Amino acid sequence: MAQVKRVRRDVSGIILLDKPRGFTSNAALQKVRWLLNAEKAGHTGSLDPLATGVLPLCFGEATKFSQYLLDADKAYETVMQLGVTTTTADAEGEVLERKPVAVTREQLEALLPQFRGDILQVPPMYSALKRDGQPLYKLARAGEVVEREPRSVNIARLELLALEGDKARLAVACSKGTYIRTLVEDLGQQLGCGAHVAELRRTQAGPFDLSQTVTLETLERLHGEGGAEALDALLQPVDSGLEHWPLLQLSEHSAYYWLHGQPVRAPEAPKYGMVRVQDNNGRFIGIGEVSEDGRIAPRRLIRSE
């Protein structure tokens, strides 16, 4: 008997998942996509399997704007295990070396200013970055080490929250592309004892924080009680990750031409930059960019219903 193909639902919005430990970001995405029975899905940047916390998952039309969340700043809390280095710079890797730890709070706090602001980081071998089409982590698993170019990142906040024995808890706010594993490893190297990430929790991704997230257990319970439709109430609006952008409302006439790819003028438009755009009924219809001549050029459009 032929298997009946599951018909996916055309749903749009963002679910803010508190990613559980042990899941890759893609595995978490596919699990939630299955629960939501969504046709189209994408996440906004990977969290390591060891990490937990804020993972925005985009569905339907929201996937058109996932890149802008990927580019957003992030915040984390991490537990740094002093005295132990590993192959992956976190607790998932094999131990490379153990050293005695005699680090004081004063020593660690004196070191932190060197890692604030604009710094250069060498990405870890165990990362999703690619070399000649191959992810670095696959090369690392094969025992290969390749040269990686340092990358500029920004650490807006780096604060010691607690130091208990050989474990330090840090709060970090940083730009996209920052590797907390590399930050912790570099700190350990400077302290002379080595270190790795024992725990990592993302507390913020762009405008979203932990208070807005939902657990996988909650999603599974709601699905069990009311099916995929029971999860729809948890979907954030498609443009919720862009609420810090200026919002412009077009007249019916202008919205028609804008949705057909034509730049238009709008009252109260900023002089430059990206903007969210609504039609005359207040419906979000896409994002645009202010051109040099002051007109709003469409960049990504929402499919009309």
Curated annotation (Swiss-Prot):
Family as reported in the entry's similarity comment: Belongs to the pseudouridine synthase TruB family. Type 1 subfamily.
A GO term for molecular function: tRNA pseudouridine(55) synthase activity
HAMAP family cross-referenced by the UniProt entry: TruB_bact (MF_01080)
The keyword Metal-binding is assigned to this record: no
UniProt cross-references to PANTHER family, sorted A to Z: PSEUDOURIDYLATE SYNTHASE TRUB1, TRNA-PSEUDOURIDINE SYNTHASE
Reaction it catalyzes: uridine(55) in tRNA = pseudouridine(55) in tRNA
Gene: truB
UniProt cross-references to NCBIfam families, sorted A to Z: TruB (TIGR00431)
Organism in which the protein naturally occurs: Stutzerimonas stutzeri (strain A1501)
Keywords: Isomerase, tRNA processing
The organism's taxonomic lineage, starting at the top: Bacteria, Pseudomonadati, Pseudomonadota, Gammaproteobacteria, Pseudomonadales
Name recorded for this polypeptide: tRNA pseudouridine synthase B
